[in-house]
Amino acid sequence: MNKIIAIANQKGGVGKTTTAVNLAASLAATKRKVLLIDLDPQGNATTAAGIKEENPNTLYEIFFENISINDSIYSSSSGYEILPGGQDLLALEVGIRNQNQQQFLAKTIQNLKTEFDYT
């Protein structure tokens, strides 16, 4: 059964990324299948995961370009999978609101329910 953990706070610099990356790595070290979704336009969790690709697929491509989520998940250097973040997520927020698709993320995660122990 997939467990979803959300780490959120409006204030910057409080350790959200550090907590998320370390939690994902710790769970992966115990042989659990983990997907970290980086929703930060700065993409710091993506960088911390060791993703070197210049413009990796993000939720933006899944929403606007109908890219498969499986083509948007990358393996981290610490043993967990990551759906990268990046600057295009700023436009995604507007698109979701304008198209009245507030359930987009929930539906996207639902499709992965059986593939990961933790998201």
Enumerate the language-model features and the residues they cover:
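P-loop NTP-binding core
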Residues: M1-T119
